[in-house]
């Protein structure tokens, strides 16, 4: 039996590898082929603390002050209203206290398994140095904002992660980077992938060693009786793990999935005086996260809802560069600019399961900001599902039929 996994971001690669290691014959279909998926441009943050779905009463109340036009990170481009308005209506419906509580319970369970799954993955691919488990920082520019932020995070459900006030030693290190930092907190139990390029190469090597065939090109799905087929590829079972491209692929089987492109932006500059061993730093009032990769430092942020194929907005990159100057960060240009589309569903939960419309179709997509974090555990869950093993987590709340 041959299983085709469509999508070569971290969710797709993790799924293909997990299946191959269980003895399955696997073909990985890479529709992009250029590492342009969100997996390869994110902050590298293993975000075990992000238990609360962004579809929440608090988020809805905060929308006006978060708008990009007012200096915030959230952009709802007027020319793309046809793309984001239906999504926004569904998000509002998913933001009731009851649905938020249910979603938090699901994410808490998934995120509790994220770090153990990452440990297993880096051991499997022979690259344990890729996983750093030394937490991350959140910093603020005033004492009042730091006190408010610390209180909010200490009252929040952070799952298996723990939050404490940053030590004086930590603050001294952070102030070398940005003298205006007035206060900060330090998370433990979260982590970082130290180098996304190294991760991509290590995954390709592991896939090859496991016998996975990688096919570059677009997957075209069609109906074949009670199941689905991919044009030009002989596969008995198909897993859709194509990020934002999953919406069109699922539509071929009759699923109408309200998946939207939640686009993020980053800039990368030379590391200069940024320490090699410093954990990622979130500047919460600027809604950005700063991560060192090898000799580069990446600054990432923004939530732009709209079409995946819309031209990038240069104002986002310009604002990130302005934040670097305003915070006096030791990151030197010229900056490399990148934009990618996070695949997001209105309740901010992923979709993982088996199709009710095609007997041989399975799916794993919609991980929003948590694609990198949840990729290894998602791959294991899908492998459980296809091998007939009861998944360690109840997947019913993640079925696409919830929409």
Predicted regions, residues:
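Beta1/beta-strand and adjacent pyrophosphate-binding region of the FAD-binding site
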Residues: 1-9
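N-terminal Rossmann-fold NAD(P) dinucleotide-binding loop
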Residues: 12-13
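Glycine-rich FAD pyrophosphate-binding loop
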Residues: 20-41
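Active-site substrate-recognition segment that forms the wall
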Residues: 44-45, 50, 54-94, 221-224, ...
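Rossmann-like flavin
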Residues: 85-205
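A conserved short coil-to-beta-strand element within the FAD-binding core of flavoproteins
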Residues: 167-174, 192, 213-229
